[in-house]
């Protein structure tokens, strides 16, 4: 849930595989993590679908804290530099310097941005709010919504919807 609600130029897909058999297909995702005997390998910028592309190894044998730090940096750098609706794989393909440049920014902090990227991610994580949970739990917000089909006994049902019973199941007629 760490990245839940993270707004990015395009949807993000992640996977974690517990071994090198790679059952979760982590190398076909925007961020893929594969367990090793010494820690975790971090793969980035993969893509499935119409234009499949294997993710590339960004860093290997990472401990958990370093892994999360690199993922945070990667996501924030992508969010800040990618074009609207641009997948990570296309972003990476268009990046001058390619994977070497990305490694230098994320792993080696060549631009001196690491602390700022991490701070921004922590801010996003710390201020995340599930809008739908707020709507469900706050009666004032709930007043803006109206019941449609599933009106309870004490609520006004929609008069335009007729229910029938067919084979013992309620159907909309």
Regions found by a protein language model. Give the residues of each.
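Peripheral terminal and linker regions in Fe-S/redox and tRNA-modifying enzymes
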Residues: 1-173
